[in-house]
């Protein structure tokens, strides 16, 4: 059996237009479901940390602990280091407990039972073998510690008015068809965890929703995805001519939707918090 690939999402290299659509993520916008489990002395591991904007938001919650972000891409780690240098809260409060490591989610460079909190955000959705990844996340978690995972469920996406739905969801569909993204990761999380030998009664499952509807958020999300569809290396079709035509069509649809006061886009994320048996 071939070894699973770490980085399907950036298989063709890190793309700044894709990374920008991830850079708005922070613990406060994306990880509130797990913050109540965090203690000020905890060691947190953020696996698949991407551009690091969630990772660098954790240190203020663990001023007496430590935060480490892990990525298999040095290019993304460079972006994460830049995010760390820019984090004003850490400078102001003189917190210096965050670092980054190159590593694979399938073989994390840490001993067993090392971290109090092990976190992933929109990582398993892109993996060939999420169950193997969950086994490894649990391995490095201390007994009594927590594995926290949040993953999008792309098939839950809804767009209104209906006239925009097909074109606005073409990017998600292309990630499913061409880039290996799992369309039902959010709803699969609990099942994957049980397949990874997590104890069922120790898994707390929940869900949250992204909603882009008011004028400000429509403008913001449209700008990000128009730039992404026009300029990133994320293809919509294998045929060059069709790809260019679809890119233009999707960008125009985002522009029209942005200006439509009826516009609404929402999607569900599945979430699990697993307490490792002591």
Curated annotation (Swiss-Prot):
<dbReference type="GO" id="GO:0032259">
    <property type="term" value="P:methylation"/>
</dbReference>
<keyword id="KW-0539">Nucleus</keyword>
<keyword id="KW-0489">Methyltransferase</keyword>
<keyword id="KW-0808">Transferase</keyword>
<dbReference type="GO" id="GO:0005829">
    <property type="term" value="C:cytosol"/>
</dbReference>
<dbReference type="InterPro" id="IPR013216">
    <property type="entry name" value="Methyltransf_11"/>
</dbReference>
<dbReference type="GO" id="GO:0008168">
    <property type="term" value="F:methyltransferase activity"/>
</dbReference>
<comment type="function">
    <text>Probable methyltransferase.</text>
</comment>
<protein>
    <recommendedName>
        <fullName>Uncharacterized methyltransferase C1B3.06c</fullName>
        <ecNumber>2.1.1.-</ecNumber>
    </recommendedName>
</protein>
<dbReference type="InterPro" id="IPR029063">
    <property type="entry name" value="SAM-dependent_MTases_sf"/>
</dbReference>
<dbReference type="GO" id="GO:0005634">
    <property type="term" value="C:nucleus"/>
</dbReference>
<dbReference type="Pfam" id="PF08241">
    <property type="entry name" value="Methyltransf_11"/>
</dbReference>
<keyword id="KW-0963">Cytoplasm</keyword>
<dbReference type="GO" id="GO:0008757">
    <property type="term" value="F:S-adenosylmethionine-dependent methyltransferase activity"/>
</dbReference>
């Amino acid at each position: 059996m071939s070894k699973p690939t770490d980085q399907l999402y950036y298989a063709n290299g890190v793309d700044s237009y894709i990374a920008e659509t991830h850079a708005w993520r922070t613990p406060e916008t994306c990880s509130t479901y797990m913050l109540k489990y965090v203690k000020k002395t905890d060691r947190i591991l953020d696996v698949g940390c991407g551009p690091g904007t969630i990772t660098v938001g954790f240190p203020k919650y663990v001023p007496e602990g430590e935060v480490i972000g892990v990525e298999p891409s040095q290019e993304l780690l460079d972006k994460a280091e830049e995010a760390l240098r820019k984090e004003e809260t850490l400078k102001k409060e003189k917190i210096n407990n965050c670092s980054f490591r190159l590593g694979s989610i399938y073989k994390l460079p840490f001993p067993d039972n090392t971290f109090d909190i092990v976190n992933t955000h929109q990582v398993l959705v892109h993996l060939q073998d999420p169950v193997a990844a969950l086994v490894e996340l649990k391995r490095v978690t201390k007994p009594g510690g927590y594995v926290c995972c949040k993953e999008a469920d792309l098939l839950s996406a809804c767009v209104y008015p209906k006239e925009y739905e097909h074109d606005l969801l073409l990017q998600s569909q292309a990630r499913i068809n061409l880039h290996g993204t799992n369309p039902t990761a959010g709803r699969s999380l609990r099942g994957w965890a049980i397949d990874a030998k997590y104890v069922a009664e120790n898994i707390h499952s929940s869900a949250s929703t992204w909603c882009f509807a008011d004028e400000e958020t429509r403008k913001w999300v449209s700008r990000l995805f128009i730039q992404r569809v026009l300029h990133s290396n994320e293809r919509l079709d294998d045929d060059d001519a069709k790809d260019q035509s679809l890119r233009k069509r999707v960008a125009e649809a985002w522009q029209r939707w942005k200006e439509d006061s009826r516009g609404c886009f929402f999607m569900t994320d599945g979430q699990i918090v697993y307490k490792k048996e002591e």
